[in-house]
Regions:
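Conserved phosphate- and dinucleotide-binding cores of soluble alpha/beta proteins
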Residues: 84-202
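N-terminal active-site beta-alpha-beta segment that forms phosphate/nucleotide-binding
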Residues: 2-80, 85-90
Length: 202
């Protein structure tokens, strides 16, 4: 982890390593200022760490833009638009590399767009199980190991949700529409990456 932290810092990311989920939660809360407006991309990792639940149950300390309350696609679109102006955007990354790059595949694009631009800060929590040797390996990992179980979790009728294997589909339900590699951050102190020494997410 020490090597990856150095590589990430070289890319103007703030990087940290925590041994456990509990440490990761504490670290994330030390980064997020009270009184902030917070939004989140869909993330099993953020939920597993307990960060999402903490933010939601401390409404006196934070304003949370909750996408789960959307009743239809238009409301969801408006909530995603508000998230772009949040103070802190919470997410995981689909993979990250030994040389410190972030690699993500997205469906709607709301998650990767927030990573690229908009929120003042992005807080990323990721398990060390998502570490890969290279960007090419990262994309392979995501399509082979992450997206099929994610489609099952989301109840999407994609070929991979049935077979467990990426079929390189063009399905309307595909979550593999946008491929984004984040090489560095133009703005220092914007992107915070918390690596956790546990298997988290997909």
């Amino acid at each position: 982890a020490e090597h990856v932290i150095k590589q990430m810092e070289r890319r103007h990311f703030n990087a940290y390593y925590c041994s456990t989920k509990e440490e990761a939660l504490s670290k994330a809360l030390s980064i997020i200022e009270k009184g902030s407006v917070i939004a989140s991309g869909g993330s099993a990792t953020i939920e597993e760490v307990g960060l999402l639940n903490y933010i939601k149950t401390h409404s006196e300390e934070y304003t949370f833009i909750d996408r789960s309350i959307a009743k239809n696609e238009e409301e969801k679109r408006q909530i995603h638009a508000k998230a772009i102006l949040s103070d802190y955007y919470l997410m995981s990354t689909n993979a990250f590399t030994m040389d410190g790059q972030l690699v993500n595949i997205d469906g709607n694009g709301n998650r990767v767009s927030a990573l690229c631009y908009g929120p003042k800060h992005v807080v990323i929590i990721t398990g060390m199980n998502k570490l890969t040797p290279s960007v090419e390996d990262a994309y392979k990992r995501i399509r082979q190991d992450a997206c099929p179980p994610n489609c099952v979790r989301l109840g999407l009728p994609t070929p991979c949700s049935k077979t467990g294997v990426c079929g390189d589909c063009m399905s309307a339900s595909s979550i593999c529409d946008l491929f984004v590699t984040t090489r560095m951050s133009r703005y220092p102190d914007r992107i915070h990456i918390i690596m956790v020494g546990e298997e988290l997410g997909y």
